[in-house]
A protein has these predicted regions:
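Residues embedded in well-ordered regular secondary structure
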Residues: 1-27, 194-198, 215, 489, ...
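Extracytoplasmic gating/loop element in the C-terminal half of outer-membrane beta-barrel translocons
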Residues: 95-97, 114, 502, 555-648, ...
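Aromatic-residue-lined binding/catalytic grooves and analogous aromatic/hydrophobic interfacial grooves
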Residues: 21, 136, 485, 537
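Transmembrane beta-barrel wall of Gram-negative outer-membrane proteins
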Residues: 1-74
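Extracellular/periplasmic, surface-exposed regions of secreted and cell-surface proteins
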Residues: 49-58, 63-68, 73-78, 83-85, ...
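Catalytic-site beta-strand/loop segments enriched in glycine and acidic/polar residues
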Residues: 226-234, 262-271, 507-530
């Protein structure tokens, strides 16, 4: 970090380099001297801020951020690689045969180690530049408090791709009729490394221009601010029809009386190129008000309160990340026709595709908030907020809202609605002494969403509807145990998913029709997408330059479906089995039928057992030490000797421990 300058020019710059090495075994990532297939990430960031006072009335601000990033891995993706490692039993075959070829067998026909070491590499190089330039002109010569600003900004993010592929041969070993091993080779023995330099894989360019006029006056106990702004944005992504444009015309007015009563009003006229012709603009207002009670005379005698503020706000915003062709109808070439009676040969023709949207609109979010801020006892701060968000015009599938009798595919519609209510709290206590200081803070948020309209259409039973539940609410079957024997199966409702046997999961018949099918699902657990509760604790201290900072984070009211193959759902389609199933759980057998908590083992793809249900539902809440930072600040006298303001050495670690309910997976 470098900072300096004088009266007319000031600068600040930060250079940051980070190298993240992968966790793959170097014995195999260094398998060949032609390339290294280890997962690697390199980051190099350079930030520079420059402030120039051209004159006393004219100022220039330049901010720039440049980033170089390189990501490298085997040509086998991380997801595929770890899936193969999970699913391949460790004793299924040797990593390499005695002939030096990669091992495999006739069932799996893959080798995760070979797919790590001997398939080449995939590399992405990312180049990013973010720059903005702002000119500020004081116009007090015209009238006191008047100023103007001109700004331009340019972001360019480009990614270049290089792939080096090769194939390998693997060998299976089987016992012959004479008892001797029989070796069979599969795959391509070609050892050539085919390098494909795609060059520019994708590019995103974001540019904007802004012109703004500001006015600020104070007199007696009054403080008045106003501004008018015009902004033009353009965003371009690699590919066809990926450019979009936005315009903002924004006016703001703010008034403060005696630093006690404050009101701010914003009027935003927003235009988007994705909207139809002659229908490009929408209005998005906002208003906020605040009352600083601690500045009132009746609070002067209450020494415990250093600051007390009550505030409320309302605002509307829009969302326009939509495709361009939603208001157009296309004809597709999969139609057919017949000429003359008795002709059985169909001719090709066009037919109507999905209908066009009649009027595409923007998603709208109306946000209401009321809050209280306070500071107490010369060191304690506290804030509490209550909020209500109402989202409407959400783009959803229209097929559930219009009858299929129309005879053509229904387009999406701006008909979705979601409400969210919640509260947020935060507090901090700080104390400083001569050589020692410490702090401890906490935050908590609770937000519960409710789907009002999702376009799901008619449901034969009310409990099947996702309306009224949070976003991402988990739905599935209620598991009520396991079939004990054939008599139990005979006397129970018919489960339609697959043939059941003793030890298979037994589900509740919600509609009482003696059949277990898709009509017996219901809401189970919480959302699997968004936790309702977030909380955190941050604390630290410093003593004579030595300090520790720690951040703890947690979530609650969150569900996880344990459906990872081989880990929680074992042996399906010749996959693996984990310690979780073998040792941590009690699988169903004739001897354990009274205490079992997971179904019987089977190598078949058991559609009855392996589906979303309370059998596999787990509490997804956790509490973890997210960050720990230990540092030492050298005495300032040492720093001054080398012309620096501050010298600090530190050690930092992430995710040191976690308390949760999900074993083996994060």
């Amino acid at each position: 970090t470098f900072r300096g300058g004088g009266k007319r020019l000031r600068y600040f710059s930060v250079l940051n380099y980070k190298n993240d090495m992968g966790l793959l075994n170097s014995k195999y990532t260094d398998y060949t001297d032609r390339y290294n297939s280890q997962m690697k990430k390199y980051f190099l960031n350079l930030r520079m801020n420059l402030d120039v006072d051209i004159t006393d009335a004219t100022k220039l601000k330049l901010n720039m951020l440049g980033m170089l990033r390189e990501t490298k891995r085997p040509t086998t993706s991380e997801a595929t690689l770890f899936e193969q490692i999970f699913n391949t039993p460790s004793a299924a075959f040797p990593v390499q045969t005695q002939n030096g070829l990669w091992g495999s067998n006739n069932v799996l026909k893959t080798n995760p180690i070979a797919n790590l070491a001997d398939v080449g590499y995939y590399k992405l190089n990312q180049r990013m530049l973010q720059a903005d330039l702002r000119l500020i002109q004081d116009l007090s010569v015209l009238t006191r408090g008047l100023s103007a600003e001109l700004a331009i900004a340019y972001d360019n993010n480009a990614t270049y791709q290089e792939t080096a592929k090769k194939s390998f041969m693997y060998q299976t070993i089987e016992k012959g009729t004479d008892g001797e091993p029989v070796y069979t080779n599969y795959g391509n023995p070609n050892d050539e490394l085919e390098i494909s330099n795609k060059g520019l894989a994708n590019q995103y360019i974001h540019a904007n221009f802004e012109a703004k006029v500001n006015y600020h006056r104070t007199w007696d106990k009054h403080d008045f601010t106003a501004s008018a702004m015009f902004r033009q944005e353009s965003m371009t992504l690699t590919g066809a029809n990926n450019s979009r444009y936005r315009q903002y015309i924004i006016g703001t007015v703010g008034y403060n009386f005696d630093n006690r009563y404050m009101v701010d009003v914003v009027a935003n006229c927003f235009g988007s190129s994705v909207l139809g012709k002659n229908d490009k603009y929408r209005a998005y207002p906002a208003i906020s008000a605040a009352w600083i009670l601690s500045n009132e005379n009746f609070m002067k005698g209450i020494s415990a309160f250093d600051y007390l503020k009550l505030r409320a706000s309302y605002g509307r915003s829009g969302y326009d990340i939509y495709d361009y062709d939603m208001d157009k109808q296309y004809w597709i070439g999969s139609g057919s026709y017949y000429f003359q009676a008795g002709n059985t040969s169909a001719g090709s023709s066009l037919k109507e595709g999905m209908l066009a949207m009649e009027q595409l609109d923007l998603e709208v979010a109306d946000k209401y908030n009321i809050g209280l801020d306070m500071s107490l006892l010369k060191g304690l701060t506290f804030s509490i907020d209550g909020f209500y968000d109402k989202r409407s015009n959400i783009l959803i599938e229209g097929s559930g809202l219009i009858s299929s009798a129309i005879g053509v595919t229904i387009p999406q519609m701006n008909a979705g609605k979601v409400e969210t209510k919640g509260t947020e709290l935060s507090t901090m206590w700080k104390k400083e002494y001569k050589n020692f200081s410490y702090y401890i803070g906490a935050n908590f948020s609770y937000a519960k969403s409710k789907v009002i309209e999702n376009g799901e259409g008619y449901q034969p039973y009310g409990y099947l509807s996702k309306k009224g539940y949070p976003i991402g609410q988990c739905f599935g079957w209620e598991a009520i145990g396991y079939f004990r024997d054939e008599e139990d199966i005979k006397n129970s409702p018919v489960q339609k998913f697959s043939e059941v046997r003793p030890g298979d999961v037994k589900y509740r018949d919600l509609n009482g029709d003696k059949v277990i099918d898709s009509n017996d699902q219901k809401a189970i657990g919480y959302s699997t997408a968004i936790p309702e509760i977030y909380y955190g604790i941050n604390l630290g201290f410093e003593y004579k330059g030595f300090g520790v900072d720690a951040l703890f984070q947690g979530v609650g009211h969150y569900s996880v479906m344990l459906n990872t193959a081989s880990v929680y759902w074992p042996l399906r389609n010749n996959t693996n089995i984990s310690n979780w199933y073998l040792n941590d759980k009690i699988r169903w057998t004739e001897d354990t039928k009274d205490i079992a908590n997971v179904p019987r083992l089977t190598t078949l793809d058991n559609a009855n057992n392996f589906r979303n249900s309370t059998q596999w539902l787990e509490n997804g809440s956790y509490f973890k030490l997210r960050n720990l930072n230990v540092y030492y600040n050298f005495p300032s006298s040492w720093a001054k000797k080398v012309k620096m303001e501050k010298i600090q050495v530190y050690a930092r670690a992430n995710n040191l421990f976690s308390l949760d309910h999900v074993k083996y997976m994060n």
